[in-house]
C-alpha cells in the first residue's frame, strides 16, 4: 500500500496553554479556557490543520488522579472544542513523574516533555510532517520537545493564545497556502 502523504499540524500543550491550570487539573467543574484558546482552535481548524495535544500528566504517576479521570476530562475538552468551532484530532499524554512512589512511574521515559516521544508517536499515527509543524506551550520543556522533534516551537506567555496563533499562521502556513500574495 502507498504511504499517505505527510501533512503539517499544530501541537499544543494542554495546561496553561489551552486551559487554565491551578495545580493538577482533572475535574470538569474546574474547566476554563485560556484567553484566546477558542479563537485559536477555530483558526487552526478553518485552515485545515490537525491539532494535537501533548501533555505531561504526572498527577497520574503521583496518584493524585487516575488515567480514567484524565480521559474523562480530555473527552470534555474535545467536546468543548467542537462546540465552539474548533477540533482536537488526538491527545497524547505522559503519566510518569520523577517523584512518583511507584518505581515504574518514576523511571526515566521517552514521553515526558522535554523528551519528544509523544510528538513522534502522534506523527507516526497520523502521518504528520514534524518539520512542517509547530509546537506551542507555556513551558521551556514544551519548546524543547518541539525542537528535539525538528519542529518550530513557540513559548506561550499565557496571554492571548489567538494572538500567538495568528503569528504562527502568518509565519508558517499562510505564505505557503495563499498564492495570491
What are these regions (language model features)?
Residues 37, 41-77, 86-97, 146:
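Substrate-recognition element of Asp-dependent hydrolases with the DxDx(T/V) motif
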Residues 18-21, 56-58, 97-100, 120-123:
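A short alpha-helix capping/helix-coil boundary motif
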Residues 18-35, 60-69, 83-86, 102-110:
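Metal-dependent phosphoesterase signature
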Residues 11, 54-58, 132:
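Short, flexible coil/turn micro-motifs enriched in small/turn-prone residues
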Residues 1-52:
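Active-site neighborhood of HAD-like aspartate-dependent phosphohydrolases
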Residues 3-10, 68-89, 98-135, 139-181:
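Asp-based, Mg2+/Mn2+-dependent phosphohydrolase catalytic module
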